[in-house]
Amino acid sequence: MAVLEILTAPDPRLRVQSKEVTDVAAVQTLIDDLLETLYETDNGVGLAAPQVGREEAIVVIDLSENRDEPLVLVNPKVVSGSNKEMGQEGCLSVPDYYADVERYTSVVVEALDRDGKPLRIETSEFLAIVMQHEIDHLSGNLFIDYLSPLKQQMAMKKVKKHNKLRAR
């Protein structure tokens, strides 16, 4: 297992459309690496393969306090949603910036688990929001794409400042 570098905006690899995984057995190491990378962050609850420069349609999420209940979603799709609300979001690929984004508060997601078995998850509240956020990454979308141009500029200024500090 390895901790991978998390890309930050405006890295063009974050905008790449993910490719469907056809052989789940072939991505087990990537799944392990995504989880290890997620667990190395201070406050991350989800990570998508494009955030580490990979094109596979894989998302990992862990909302547990002890970070020991991973949810692995391969080829996930939001098949329905209801009750939109505004809520604050952040992103490991847009460090140090948070903004209100409108999302469904209840969703149905279909995916494969890490063993290739079909999953259908009906969920609400925070998990529903995290799933939508991470699945957006698979389409090359970031949460800041839902913001006004002015707020997008503010977000990118924060990211540039973060990257300068990190480069020291």
Swiss-Prot record:
Superkingdom assignment: Bacteria
SUPFAM superfamilies: Peptide deformylase
Keyword Hydrolase: yes
Gene3D superfamilies per the UniProt record, alphabetical: Peptide deformylase
Pfam families: Pep_deformylase
InterPro entries according to UniProt: Peptide_deformylase, Peptide_deformylase_sf
EC number: 3.5.1.88
Catalytic activity: N-terminal N-formyl-L-methionyl-[peptide] + H2O = N-terminal L-methionyl-[peptide] + formate
Keywords of this entry: Hydrolase, Iron, Metal-binding, Protein biosynthesis
A GO MF label: metal ion binding
Cofactor: Fe(2+)
PANTHER family referenced in this protein's UniProt entry, alphabetically: PEPTIDE DEFORMYLASE
Its biological purpose: Removes the formyl group from the N-terminal Met of newly synthesized proteins. Requires at least a dipeptide for an efficient rate of reaction. N-terminal L-methionine is a prerequisite for activity but the enzyme has broad specificity at other positions.
Entry's family note: Belongs to the polypeptide deformylase family.
Cited HAMAP family: Pep_deformylase (MF_00163)
Protein's UniProt name: Peptide deformylase 2
